[in-house]
Amino acid sequence: MDEEPERTKRWEGGYERTWEILKEDESGSLKATIEDILFKAKRKRVFEHHGQVRLGMMRHLYVVVDGSRTMEDQDLKPNRLTCTLKLLEYFVEEYFDQNPISQIGIIVTKSKRAEKLTELSGNPRKHITSLKEAVDMTCHGEPSLYNSLSMAMQTLKHMPGHTSREVLIIFSSLTTCDPSNIYDLIKTLKAAKIRVSVIGLSAEVRVCTVLARETGGTYHVILDESHYKELLTHHLSPPPASSSSECSLIRMGFPQHTIASLSDQDAKPSFSMAHLDGNTEPGLTLGGYFCPQCRAKYCELPVECKICGLTLVSAPHLARSYHHLFPLDAFQEIPLEEYNGERFCYGCQGELKDQHVYVCAVCQNVFCVDCDVFVHDSLHCCPGCIHKIPAPSGV
């Protein structure tokens, strides 16, 4: 006995993530189902792409972050707040990559109050900087769903009818402290066509279920960090637009970036309109994007002109939104033993070892599950189909 190497007994070990130790055999014993749930969620998201459906391409989204004392719990590492802010940094980057003509804002609720961390804006750098600074935020008190939703609604209700109005709530607490009847507010949100979705970090809460159901949103409770990221990814694609939403042509301007040098005699320094309501000190600059209608200057696109209201974008912004309207068809799932072709993934060239493979119905090339998800979530086009297109003559 003395010669046995020292090792921690099961009853001496920590209780961290004990649910992942469970296994299930063919007789029906217990098993860790986390990976299976994540796998099914990935595949479900591939099949959920809305083809031939009106989508809210111009999105206005407020993210409400719970800042109550429950965010200091350490079931997510290092704690719920830090994990949430890190995942939101990823979410903001991906959101603007897939929705370049949309805007986002962040609200924090704690101590029965709500305050804006960032205003609605199309500038991802500003949001990411604010999220990095919020890591040092003190979590205390209870959240207030009522105050948070009221604050978001005050801005969203003035958005044009052809845009999507959304709120995503990251809810850690099991309680909410509200100054009035929240069910009356839910009716107001529904009338204003504001879609509210909730991601719970603790357990299902009745008021969140009603809130999501009545406004047409979704409500999920996370299993672990990976599932948390999957649920956030679910909100990157634009939701289907309601049949009652306005359908009209939208005037847009496509300003070119003008660069002037100090040696240019005709160059006139000017202020950027984007600095009017910002915290940064306005400064005189020579170059920028000039609105083709009123000549107001802006530092970056996309933006809505503060003078004439014209939406200013660039052509690549519209091109990157195009894939949502015509999504790539889902690949066919086939058991590996029934597949007679080469046992290598066409995307990563790795050996196919999973129980199922995924075949493109057009080019008949086979992919592993990771490449399948990557193709549908990021590339939005099949590599095999692209390679089969003949090159133009003379190239």
UniProtKB/Swiss-Prot annotation:
Entries under PROSITE patterns matching the protein: VWFA
Subcellular localization: Nucleus
This protein's record includes keyword Signal: no
Keyword NADP: no
Modified residues (Phosphotyrosine): Y95
GO MF assignments: zinc ion binding
Gene Ontology annotations of biological process type: DNA-templated transcription; nucleotide-excision repair; regulation of transcription by RNA polymerase II
Domain VWFA span(s) in chain numbering: 60-236
InterPro entries cross-referenced by the UniProt entry: C1-like_sf, Ssl1-like, TFIIH_C1-like_dom, TFIIH_SSL1/p44, VWF_A, vWFA_dom_sf, Znf_C2H2_type, Znf_RING/FYVE/PHD
Keywords (A to Z) from UniProt: DNA damage, DNA repair, Metal-binding, Nucleus, Phosphoprotein, Transcription, Transcription regulation, Zinc, Zinc-finger
SMART domains: C1_4 (SM01047), VWA (SM00327)
A GO CC term assigned to this protein in UniProt: transcription factor TFIIH holo complex
Zinc finger C4-type: from-to: 291-308
Main location: nucleus
Superkingdom of the source species: Eukaryota
NCBIfam families, per the entry: ssl1 (TIGR00622)
Job of this protein: Component of the core-TFIIH basal transcription factor involved in nucleotide excision repair (NER) of DNA and, when complexed to CAK, in RNA transcription by RNA polymerase II.
Similarity comment text for this entry: Belongs to the GTF2H2 family.
Protein name stated in the entry: General transcription factor IIH subunit 2-like protein
Source organism of the structure: Homo sapiens (Human)
